[in-house]
Design a protein with these regions (language model features):
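Compositional signal for N-terminal targeting/processing segments
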Residues: 1-150
Length: 150
């Protein structure tokens, strides 16, 4: 059977809805629209940054998570964890020794957090996980402010 286009439609409909709610609120009440946009930026960015921090990511990886999350949350193909993970991998470059010890380090918690390869993966996964949580909270707040003004 051919692939359904429903997941693609849903993947783009939710971000379009969020942006539309903010734009409509801006036109009816600029102050509330600003509050919505600020809420979206702070919830998505902060939660993604918290995820990167929980993974003990480099401060620039945490900053990358905060800066990219509000935009990547609106794009179904991009993820803020990719950008924070890329920053982590660029700043704290894994060595050949990290790759060689990978098969041993994945079996202990200490090794999992110490190995630079798995640390990059932790930064990616936790940034995305917490960023998704921030997207739900921020989206709910955008909807709340929208209905409060109408």
């Amino acid at each position: 059977p051919p692939k359904s286009i429903v997941p693609k439609i849903i993947g783009w409909a939710i971000p379009i809805l969020i942006v539309a709610l903010i734009v409509i609120t801006f036109f009816t009440n600029p102050s509330a629209g600003f509050d919505q946009a600020l809420s979206w930026i702070l919830w998505t960015g902060s939660m993604a940054a918290v995820g990167a921090a929980v993974a003990l990511g480099h401060p620039l990886a945490i900053l990358a998570a905060f800066v990219t999350a509000p935009v990547t949350a609106l794009h179904p193909i991009l993820a803020s964890g990719w950008f924070s993970g890329l920053a982590q991998a660029y700043i704290k470059r894994p060595t050949i020794a990290d790759f060689e010890k990978l098969s041993e380090d994945v079996f202990t918690i200490k090794g999992f957090w110490r190995n630079k390869v798995t640390r990059v993966l932790l930064v990616v996964v936790l940034t995305n996980l917490f960023g998704s949580l921030g997207t739900f909270i921020g989206g709910a707040d955008v909807i709340r402010v929208f209905f409060k003004n109408f």
